Amino acid sequence: MTLKNALLAFRNAINILDKNLINLLAKRKQLSLNIAHTKVKNNYPVRDIEREQMLLKNLTILGEKHFLNKKYIESLFSIILEDSVLTQKKWIKKYNLNKYKLEKISFLGSFGSYSHLAAQKYAKKHSKILTDKIYKNFSDVITSVEQQQSTYAILPIENQSSGLIIEVYKLLQKTPLFIIGNIYIHANHCLLAKKYTPILKIQKIYSHIQPFKQCSKFISLFPNWKLSNTTSTSEAIQHVAKENDNTIAALGNESYGELNKLEVIAKNISNKRNNITQFIILAQKKTYITNKKTHLKTIILISKKNENCEKIIRNILHKNKITLLKLKYYVTSKVLLEKIFFIEIENIYCIKHILKQFTIEIKCIKILGCF
């Protein structure tokens, strides 16, 4: 074999080894990605300095056995380890970004509605983002989560002035979503109109049906006013702001009115001074709470035409030493005398036993969720 042929043979052998090294490095990178997935799943940190130091030590010992320079092995594998860490960090960052993007909150109306304020408050506390879609009814808000367009839906369920929001309660009976939390918002309604609009000149008011109910005493002072329902308070404010008409006004929140260059004609007009609305957060997955002190379950109970249904519920809970936090109901049919009960109870770890007792007298039971 000539010298030239010998060199060519050796170089070809090295080329094959280099290709094998590339393939091995690619396989190592894939394993690093698998490790990143496992770390995210189990909430482990990306970097394990102790393991890296131990690995370098073992590799240099192994290298010395093969007559490889210690600094050469340390330098080579330090680069490989650093690349592995960067690969994992990049993957985890992308994973978290995608997860964050998916965790959107749907709510009624647009920017400036009370539902938007509630969603904003919840998003800030739990590091979520708000959807940019505008939903004009409660049903569409729920559907957005059922169809995985959003991760969470936020809906008003009760107001101190107007009471239960029946439309939402009816939707809760049908949806497969679960309640995972709640939040409270002060609904300080204002009468908003174009600047320099005298209150006596106003003829028509725009708002969602709930503010009309919550400000009924104030509205009754002006019997000639015509009331026009909108899908949300933000829509009402936008409409009044858009129209060049000083005979119309909107009920809504002051800050959003100011953003739309409307003037506060009257404030603190709710029937109750401390007008609070409770919102619930719905999701496809249940939450599991291990802290007994904060463990609540909401249950929907549909009466079996039984006038003593409320008494039965209270007796069963009392017998099992379960604290009743809240009991609300509404009549679905005056003819059938059917009532739907919603209860919140504390520390319910014997749920199956309780459900068996309820089913003796109750037509339908549905657990809405824990929070």
Curated annotation (Swiss-Prot):
Binding-site positions, substrate: 11, 28, 39, 48, 52, 84, 88
What reaction does this enzyme carry out catalytically? chorismate = prephenate; prephenate + H(+) = 3-phenylpyruvate + CO2 + H2O
Site annotation (Essential for prephenate dehydratase activity) points to 277
State a single Gene Ontology molecular function.
chorismate mutase activity
GO annotation, biological process: chorismate metabolic process; L-phenylalanine biosynthetic process
Record keywords: Amino-acid biosynthesis included?
Answer: yes
Query: Which cell locations does it reside in?
Result: Cytoplasm
Q: Does the keyword NADP apply?
A: no
Which GO CC terms are listed, alphabetically?
cytoplasm
| Cited NCBIfam families | CM_P_1
Q: What is known of its domains?
A: The regulatory domain shows changes in the ESRP sequence, which is involved in the allosteric binding of phenylalanine. These changes suggest the desensitization of the enzyme to inhibition by phenylalanine and would permit the overproduction of phenylalanine.
Q: Which PANTHER family has this protein been placed in?
A: PREPHENATE DEHYDRATASE P PROTEIN, PREPHENATE DEHYDRATASE-RELATED
Record's protein name: Bifunctional chorismate mutase/prephenate dehydratase
Organism of origin: Buchnera aphidicola subsp. Baizongia pistaciae (strain Bp)
UniProt lists the gene as pheA
